[in-house]
Design a protein with these regions (language model features):
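Sec-dependent signal peptide recognition
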Residues: 1-4
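C-terminal motif of bacterial Sec signal peptides marking the signal peptidase cleavage site
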Residues: 7-10
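Short, conserved catalytic or interaction motifs in soluble domains
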Residues: 13
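First exposed extracellular module after export/assembly in secreted or surface-exposed proteins
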Residues: 18-135
Length: 135
């Protein structure tokens, strides 16, 4: 019996981008919605056929963009700017949780979620209709 050696190759590759190489769409998004929070690190993350950009901003904000350079995840240590939250989700949160604020927003294949600073995660469909509290 002959054993054939094989090589395990990782499909995941992270590359730190020089700030000058951050795609224009991403730089524009950050300067529009986070004018006081410049980019301090940008990582281009390739995992198989999936490509994302993981952006860290000054002030404790983290944004993930997909291969089309569309936002799919935003997290903050403090309140996110209202301009980054879809209007229906923002309206729902401010109406039903007036004493709280949003520190996270995420988009997946079927739904979107917001996270409040009190730890609650609220799930919505793609039209912005409330579905449930996600524990």
């Amino acid at each position: 019996m002959v054993l054939v050696p094989f090589l395990l190759i990782s499909c995941e590759k992270e590359k730190i981008l020089p700030l000058i190489d951050v795609p224009t769409e991403i730089s524009n998004y950050v300067s529009t919605h986070f004018p006081e929070n410049p980019i301090i690190q940008a990582i281009k993350d390739t995992d198989g056929f999936e490509l994302t950009y993981d952006i860290t901003l000054e002030g404790g904000f983290f944004i993930e963009f997909n291969r089309k350079k569309e936002v799919i995840d935003i997290e903050g240590l403090t309140k996110l700017p209202d301009s980054v939250i879809p209007a229906k989700l923002l309206e729902y949160a401010t109406t039903n949780y007036p004493d709280n604020y949003i520190i996270g927003w995420e988009l997946d294949d079927r739904n979107q979620q917001i996270k409040l600073e009190n730890g609650l995660e609220l799930e919505f469909n793609m039209n912005g209709d409330f579905l449930r509290i996600d524990n």
